């Protein structure tokens, strides 16, 4: 059964969050000057002051509710999703999937251009019917009893599309762990998922790199991860311990998420707001804070580790369905040589962007929209 859903956060809940922010003991935190050691105290405090004085969650709630929101049960988990029916004669079902620390907020500005391109100077016959789920454990979706990872989530997403929404065939797009889920859809659910578009490489071939160029890429990746891997290790091994602190600290959640937005984005002059407004940053953070899902959202890393981590199974052959790839220069980790990519995917399109980072739907929405449209027009 599919039920209509409307977000309606109480003013009391918002007020309680604001009080926690107001009472945060800033004097107990050292100012380390900059972002080298983690989230910048000066900027975080500035953002938090805006949070309690000027940020209006209800404005963002209204935007989300302006789309058609639903909930449905898949494998015992209540899944929240946006579904916007596209224009034209036969709009292709497109599953858009966020990762961590993202949410449905990432996609709010690209839904209309994809579903109603004629309103943006495009062709209505190139429209998609767009489905944007909150992943299990994230936001307004329910959580599993115990952690599971992207491979299981792919199974749930495929059931959402085929059993609950009755689409025999569909296509999928994702970045971050949304790309991981898309990979599993393309490998295990190719009878339904007919093509995927990704903007992040998150999975590895079990045979590893073979050429010198591929080996150099992996060596650079491993070196880069020395200062990047702390959050992932914590969330993949002991997520519960971190959650006790985060569940009662909106400031803590903001700090944890902001660091990644800063590190993984294509900033001008190291200015976070050269790419994102305070409102966009806080709307995404509030999805975690309002729903108390920082804990269960982090479980995806634990589940991923249990599923085998970055590597496909040893019997992996290739994802045979058509794959489109958008490469943004400030992605969290560099893309490997094309020789390695083509061992994993049946690559039909690679677009090398000249700007943008890990969150292209927020950073460079027009680039992502055009690349999605171009790829799925023929795949």
Describe each region flagged by the PLM.
Residues 13-86, 90, 289-292, 296-311:
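Non-catalytic accessory segments flanking enzyme active sites
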Residues 91-99:
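Short beta-strand element of the alpha/beta-hydrolase
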Residues 113, 117-120, 164-216:
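Conserved hydrolase catalytic core segment
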Residues 147-164:
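Alpha/beta-hydrolase active-site loop
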Residues 1, 10-15, 20-21, 25, ...:
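Alpha/beta-hydrolase
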Residues 59, 120-122, 135-148, 183, ...:
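Glycine-rich "HGGG/HGxG" loop immediately N-terminal to the catalytic nucleophile
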Residues 235-379:
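C-terminal subdomain of alpha/beta-hydrolase-fold enzymes, centered on the catalytic histidine
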Residues 100-112:
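The serine-hydrolase catalytic nucleophile loop
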């Amino acid at each position: 059964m599919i039920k209509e859903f409307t977000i309606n956060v109480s003013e009391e809940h918002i007020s309680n969050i604001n009080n926690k922010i107001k009472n945060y003991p800033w004097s107990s935190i050292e100012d380390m000057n900059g972002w080298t050691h983690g989230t910048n105290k000066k900027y975080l405090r500035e953002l938090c002051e805006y949070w309690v004085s000027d940020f209006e969650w209800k404005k963002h709630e209204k935007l989300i509710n302006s789309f058609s929101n639903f909930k449905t049960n898949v494998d015992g988990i209540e899944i929240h999703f946006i579904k916007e029916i596209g224009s034209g004669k036969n709009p292709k079902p497109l599953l858009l999937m966020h990762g961590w620390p993202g949410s449905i907020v990432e996609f709010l500005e690209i839904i209309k251009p994809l579903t109603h391109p004629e309103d943006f100077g495009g062709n209505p016959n190139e429209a998609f019917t767009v489905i944007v789920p909150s992943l299990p454990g994230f936001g307004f979706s329910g959580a599993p009893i115990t952690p599971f990872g992207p491979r299981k989530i792919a199974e749930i997403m495929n059931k959402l599309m085929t059993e609950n929404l009755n689409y025999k065939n569909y296509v999928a797009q994702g970045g971050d762990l949304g790309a991981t889920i898309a990979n599993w859809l393309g490998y295990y659910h190719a009878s339904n998922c007919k093509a995927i578009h990704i903007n992040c490489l998150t999975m590895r071939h079990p045979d590893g790199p073979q050429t010198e160029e591929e080996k150099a890429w992996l060596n650079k990746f491993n070196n880069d991860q020395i200062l990047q891997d702390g959050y992932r290790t914590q969330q993949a091994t002991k997520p519960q311990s971190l959650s006790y602190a985060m569940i009662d600290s909106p400031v803590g959640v903001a700090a944890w998420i902001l660091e990644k937005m800063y590190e993984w984005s294509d900033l001008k002059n190291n200015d976070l707001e050269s790419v994102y407004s305070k409102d966009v940053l806080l709307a995404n953070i509030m999805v975690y804070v309002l729903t108390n899902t920082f804990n269960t959202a982090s479980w995806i890393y634990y589940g991923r580790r249990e599923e085998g981590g970055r590597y496909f199974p040893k019997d992996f052959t290739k994802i045979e369905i058509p794959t489109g790839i958008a490469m943004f220069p400030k992605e969290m980790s560099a893309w490997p040589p094309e020789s390695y990519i083509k061992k994993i995917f049946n690559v039909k399109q690679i677009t090398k962007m000249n700007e943008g980072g890990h969150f292209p739907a927020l950073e460079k929405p027009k680039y992502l929209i055009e690349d999605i449209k171009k790829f799925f027009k023929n795949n």
